[in-house]
Amino acid sequence: MKTKHHGQMSESFLTAVFLSLSGGLQDAYTYLFRGKVFANAQTGNIVLLSANIMDGRWDKVLHYLVPLCAFALGVLAAEKMREHFQAMQRLHWRQLVVLGEVLLLFAVGFLPQSQNLLANAIVSFSCAMQVQAFRKVNGYAFASTMCIGDLRSGVEAFCIWRKSHEPHAKDRMVRYFGIIFLFALGAGCLLYTSPSPRDP
């Protein structure tokens, strides 16, 4: 039997669809068009930051350090918005997060290649707000801007389903792998609809 979840719209699978598409698109955008920096995958930025420090390439350090700091500030901003606007009646605080994200990403589109550092900082800040505000789909923990946790959870659910044929495990497996597919689709759509990537 298919599991139904009666909860907030922010935890619906439809919401996860759009957030995952957006997450993949944003990561592909900053990596391919803004100087090979990850907007979401801060682990990759930490690796590249460390590599450049060890190589003595100090001109590249800010290239990866600024998005890291912006991501941390984005998490703080989302938490502050939750604290201040959680009791609002007309709007849900997560709707304000989405509105802020849309405005920030719209502004990034007008920044020239010479402003890649600022563009990457804004996108990382926006991604952090998204990942902090939207952390569940149909009651299951998920991340719309990175895949490692979703991949682990999907494979775990597959192992449980293969062993016990538990319907809930199958449902989780399908949802997690679906989210990963949508993330990849978002990244692919950017390439399909954009000109060839250009390095600064």
Explain the meaning of each model-derived region:
Residues 1-9:
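Short, Lys/Arg-rich, polar N-terminal cytosolic tail immediately upstream
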Residues 19-22, 66, 70-74, 78, ...:
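Alpha-helical transmembrane segments in multi-pass membrane proteins
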Residues 41-56:
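Perimembrane loop-to-helix junctions flanking transmembrane segments
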Residues 77-87:
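Helix-to-loop junctions at the C-terminal end of transmembrane segments
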Residues 95-104:
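Structural signature of the two symmetry-related core transmembrane helices
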Residues 104-113:
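C-terminal ends and interior cores of transmembrane alpha-helices
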Residues 118-141:
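Hydrophobic core of transmembrane alpha-helices in multi-pass small-molecule transporters
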Residues 192, 197-200:
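Single conserved hydrophobic/aromatic residue that forms the stacking wall/gate
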